[in-house]
Amino acid sequence: MCEIEPENLAKLIAPSGFYNIKSVRIKSFCEAIAAKFGDFESFCELVKRPWLRKIKGVGDETCDSILCYACGQEVMVADSYSARILGAFGYEFESYDELSEWLSELDFKRVFSVCGADDVNTAYCAFHGLIDEFCKAHFKGGKFDEKALRLFENLR
């Protein structure tokens, strides 16, 4: 990735939007990983949140997504979908960190059994993935559809 020209990378990531800016940032990010950690395996093993947050373009959710999904660390990704679902039950959070901490403190025993997870990272990935898939299917135009609202009502 460090060797690819930003223009070529931009073509590969074009469907993600803002691809010209993202291609430069991704290339810079890969170069920073190579300079600091040498290789991807070392990066995954040694990287910490503060280092990632210093990278231009890496916000809280992106940082935690990298730690959870790419590095396999025990980090629960909190996102706007999570906040929306919890908001439907009356929960409000003042910051990303507050939401992330709340989600991390949930009892994941049920998630472990449902998804067959044998470690915390797998459970976090599965739980976050289920939240995203649910909201992609049932959150449109800034609101939940009737099916989601009925489900929420049954869960109260």
Model-derived regions, located:
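Catalytic cores of DNA base-excision repair glycosylases
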Residues: C2-R156
